[in-house]
Structures are given as structure tokens and as C-alpha cells.
UniProtKB/Swiss-Prot annotation:
Compartments, record wording: Membrane
Lineage of the organism: Eukaryota, Metazoa, Chordata, Craniata, Vertebrata
This protein's record includes keyword RNA-binding: no
Name of the protein described by the UniProt record: Major facilitator superfamily domain-containing protein 4A
Organism annotation: Xenopus tropicalis (Western clawed frog)
Region listing for Disordered, in residue ranges: 484-503
Main location group: membrane
Keyword Transmembrane helix among UniProt keywords: yes
Amino acid sequence: MWLDERLLALFRRNFQSTLTYWSVFFSFGLCIAFLGPTLLDLRCQTHSSLQDITWVFFAQQFCLLVGSTLGGVFKRTVKQSLFLLFLSSLTISVVFVIIPFCDHVGVLALVMAIAGLAMGCIDTISNMQLVKIYQQDSAIFLQVLHFFVGFGALLSPLIADPFLSDTNCIQSNATQNGSRNLEHIRNSLVPHHPRNVSHYVLPLQGALVTQVSYAFWIMAAINLPVPVAVFYLIYKKGMVPGCHIQNGGLLSADELAMEMHKENDSQKIEAHEEHGHAVSLLCCQNKKIWNAPFTFFAIHMCAAVTLFMTDGIVGEYSGFVYSYAVEQPLNLAHKTAGYLPSLFWAFITLGRLISIPVSYKMAPRSMLFINLIGVTATFLFLLLSQNSTTGMFVGTALLGLWLSSVFPSMLAYTEDILNYKGCATTVLVTGAGMGEMVLQILVGSVMQTQGSYSFLVCGICLSSLAFTLYAVLLVVDSLHNRASEDSACKPPGLDGEATSYQS
């Protein structure tokens, strides 16, 4: 048996909840990946310039960060979390329906901002609830969760592709000239970096010819079962006002033993709190959080900044690898270079699939160590083989594999240090989102001023910083464990300052 009986029993016990959280993350993946391929058609729909339409990316990403923080506010009860997940997943379907009717770039940006809020809530709550359900076994289920977001992100462009315009979707006298560079412009569009395409001029007035609306409506239909599944979970848990479900099923022997084990653990935790050693609940006790040891804050900071770097690498590499490949020293054809971002995301999804069985056998901290070493080594390989087309494709695939499981592994590891209270999830999700947005701007500006060769140099610097911060996190983890052991050995009341933040 691939999974042990205890884990299978736990999964069966929480099957519906787990499957619902996975499906919601599929919805998140659909929404996060559709904007890039459809942006030129949306430019035509809103009759806006390339510089204006790229700021729709910013509206989505910024509100995703806000939504991630907002999602952390609703973590106190399962009922609050599920109702917010229902509203968020339903919002995404509504957004897909509304987008074809947005004929002004400001209205489109507002709609995408609302979608970003919904996506941020989904990101935080889904991760957090799985951590709360599975605790020390959460790593494998987090890997599956992030596979679903990758699967949704792969499916979204495939749905959109048949409906994208092969020629300029605004018919005018300049259409023929603009259409020659259309595929190159589509691949060069990067969020938050409008200067990347500022030298291209496309017509703003003329007859609109686009069928991209059908792509959005198809994605809305595909996503619609997700809010239905969330609502059904709310109903099954008896959280719908006026509807109370009686669960009269008997537990199996394994499930009964597991429930008894949970009750015993809860009693131990409560007894531990009575003696003033519930450090893991500090994040929920705002009045006492500032009395926590420095290691508590250092763990959050090191983990969040590491993800700031790694998710930033994902964003900047997928955004600029095409622009790097079509210039010196590679000078790839536009069509050939266009495969690189797709290859990168395909191997991220494949890596997340591979990480599911690996995470069952390997601890998250070990996976992180191997992944971060692999990312740095791959950038060195890319730099050494910068004149090789084969090396570029191999390096891109390897980079996607190494980066694929960093976030779920870091989340599982950090929550393990902090005893699985879901406290770090909001901080880590926000840090990762900020990295993806900020580092795209930073790397894009460096490439603009220093040339395309700086693309790989930035990658080496960022990956080295990420590994260094992870090494610091390992040291802080050791110090935190030592401090916790020392605190547990002291009788309550001997050290007033130590117990003030724990009581």
C-alpha cells in the first residue's frame, strides 16, 4: 500500500473537504493564467493601448495580495472560511461571464481587481484549512493542492487558444503592419512592465473582430461546479441556516482510534496552555504576540523572504525568458522562443505531480534543501551554456522542476515548526505574492538598463539569496526548538518575563 492505513483513514474522514479545497485551487489556477494569452484581444475589446492594458495585470496582482491578507482574517472558524471560499469561487465564475462586456480598460481593471481579491482569499484559506486538517501529514496534501493550481493554469491557455485572433482584432489601415508582430507582442507582454512593448503601436480605432468572449464563457461554465461543491460542503456540515444534517454513520476502528488520538492531543495541548507554554497560539493572541521570542518572528521572516525570492524567480523567469531568448546571444526565432514559457509551466506542473509521492517519503526541509540547491545549480548551468539552444530548453525544464514544490514544502515546514496552527500561512502567501510582483518590476528594469545578459545574473543572485535565507531558517529553527525545550523544563512562575507571552 502506497499510503499507510492511518493516513488513508484520515483522508477518507476528510475526503469531501479535501476534494473541495483542491477543486477551489483548480479555479484559482484557471483565473491566474488566462489573462496573459487573452490580453491582446482584451486590448482590442477595450480599444486601449498596450501600455494601458498591461496595468490590468497590476490591478489583479495587487488585489491578490490584499485578498491574501483578507483571507487570513477569516481563519478563525471553518464556517467563515467556507462561506468566503464559496463567495470567492462564485465571483470567479461571474468575472469570466462579465469580462466580454467590459468595453473600457478602467472597467476591466476594476473587474480584475475583484477577481484578484477572490483569488487571494482562495490562496490563503485553502492552504490554511488543509494545514489545520492534516497537520504533520499536510505536506503531501499541499503538494496535491498546488498540482491542481498548475493544472488549472495549464488548461486555461489551451481553452483560450482557439479563440485568439491570428491577426489584429481591430481592423484598420495599420492592421497589416501590426499583425506581422502580433505573436511576438503576445509573448513579450509582461505584467507591471509596459516598457517591454512600448515601441509597438497598434490601432485603437476600427472594426472589432474577436471571438475571445467564448473562451471566457467556457471557463465560467467549467468553473461553475466549484462554488456548487463548496456550497454542498457547507450544507453537509450543517452550516446553512435552517438546514441541519444528522450524521449517523459509525466510524471504523481506524477512524475511531484516530479521533481518540486527536482528543488526547487536544487535552495535552489544553494542559500545556494551563502551564503557560502555548507558544504556537501566539499568532491568534494579538495582545501578547509582542512578548514572543525573537525566533518566532525570525521564522516567519526567513520563510516569507525565501518565498519572496523563489516565487519572484517564477514570475520573472516566465515573464522574461522569451525576451531573453530572442536577443543576443541566443537569437532564437520568435516561434521557437515562444515554447520556453510553456515548457517552464509544464515542468512546474509535472514537478508538483512528482512531488506528491516524494513528499510522503521525504521531509519538507530535505525537499527544500534539494530544490534550492537545484535552482541555483540550474541558473549556473544556464549561464555556462548561454550560447546553446539545447541548454536553454533543458535548463528551463529543470528550473521548473526544482521550483515546483518550494512553496508547499516551505508552508508545511514552517507550520511544522509552529505546531500547525495555520498562523504562518497568511504571511507566506503574502510574501510569495509580493515577490512575484516586485521582482518582475526589478528584473525588468535591470534588463532594460543593463541588457538581456543580466537576466541570468539576476536569477543566480536571487536563488543564492533564497538558499542563504533558508540556511538561516534552519539555524533559527534549531534555536527555536532549544528555546521551547528550555521553556518547557522551567516550572511556571520562575521566569515571569518568559511566561508573560505564553499565558
